[in-house]
Curated annotation (Swiss-Prot):
NCBIfam families referenced in this protein's UniProt entry, alphabetically: murG (TIGR01133)
Domain of life, per lineage: Bacteria
Enzyme Commission designation: 2.4.1.227
UniProt catalytic activity: di-trans,octa-cis-undecaprenyl diphospho-N-acetyl-alpha-D-muramoyl-L-alanyl-D-glutamyl-meso-2,6-diaminopimeloyl-D-alanyl-D-alanine + UDP-N-acetyl-alpha-D-glucosamine = di-trans,octa-cis-undecaprenyl diphospho-[N-acetyl-alpha-D-glucosaminyl-(1->4)]-N-acetyl-alpha-D-muramoyl-L-alanyl-D-glutamyl-meso-2,6-diaminopimeloyl-D-alanyl-D-alanine + UDP + H(+)
Residues annotated for UDP-N-acetyl-alpha-D-glucosamine binding in this entry: 14-16, 171, 200, 290
Record-stated family: Belongs to the glycosyltransferase 28 family. MurG subfamily.
Keyword Cell inner membrane: yes
Protein name according to UniProt: UDP-N-acetylglucosamine--N-acetylmuramyl-(pentapeptide) pyrophosphoryl-undecaprenol N-acetylglucosamine transferase
SUPFAM superfamilies, sorted: UDP-Glycosyltransferase/glycogen phosphorylase (SSF53756)
Keywords: Cell cycle, Cell division, Cell inner membrane, Cell membrane, Cell shape, Cell wall biogenesis/degradation, Glycosyltransferase, Membrane, Peptidoglycan synthesis, Transferase
Amino acid sequence: MSNKKIIFFTGGGTGGHIFPGISIIQKLKELDNEIEFFWIGKKNSIEEKLIKEQNNIKFISIPCGKLRRYFSFQNFTDFFKVIFGIIKSFYILKKYKPQIVYATGGFVSTPTIIASSLLKIKRITHEMDLDPGLATKINSKFANKIYISFKESEKYFKNHKNIIHTGSPIRKEFLTPNPKIIKQLTQNTNKPIVSILGGSLGANALNNLALCIKKDAEIYFIHQSGKNLNDLREDNYIRRQFFNAEEMASIVKFSNIIISRAGAGAIKEFANACTCTILIPFKKGSRGDQIKNAKLLKTQNACIYIDEDEILNANILKIIKETLKDKEKINTLKANIKKFNNKNSSALIAQLLIKDIKETKSK
């Protein structure tokens, strides 16, 4: 092992696989400024974009293929991409000799976890969702430790000896949201604020919903659309392709209602803010992870759940207006989603990683 303190993170595909890792790195920097950080991901990807916006995290790309549960001719070509990804990861890790490899999810993480296993480097895989994805299921076969965001996820890893319920880290900006930001975004409106958030990649179904309901003059709408729509401001509506972390923290905390997908990272941020939330989980083309996340909250009366197929029939504007008038319902939803809060997750994980580094270097 190197005399330096080095941790490699790997993961990507969506913000939900990247922001938690960034949060952990931010906390580690506060506790130990001698640690060097690297992130292995896919070239020209969302992880490359987000990591290169950070200070003191070096990004390295590897070839990677998508892991599929179904038959596709791409499985053959992607198989070789995975192999090349393992080989490149092997030589990268051999060169830098990190003490820990930390996988945050997504198929890009699997080659690096396998390579770190071959090199006997301590490796951790973190499942952010309730239901583990295929990448995490594979990673868990090679990992020394599995971190889970939901206690209920333990049942999926019955044969693994080292499972730790750490929660899912949230971005530091969400711990101290600034109320002035949402006032600036909404031009100091006195109207109730409803925010429609499509996530880091946007969401066509939510974009279409926003375009249908934004004309209601009684509500101020904030809309994160992703790159498929241009930025726009109207009398009671603001649309941005992306909001930065400080803006998003203010939006989540001070909106009257949030309409969102049901990624685990977003749910944890809503829980931290005690947000009244309408969840419309991604359904088409997904493995069902968001549906399980949302249904878990629904069973705890912690959100309003709407099936993606029912968006057009659900009369969401009516649901919004009825909810805004029902203070008791709002208070119940806020109190119940708060139970999923784990704002100390970054600190817990950072302390565990520092302990692992010390144990590794003492050998």
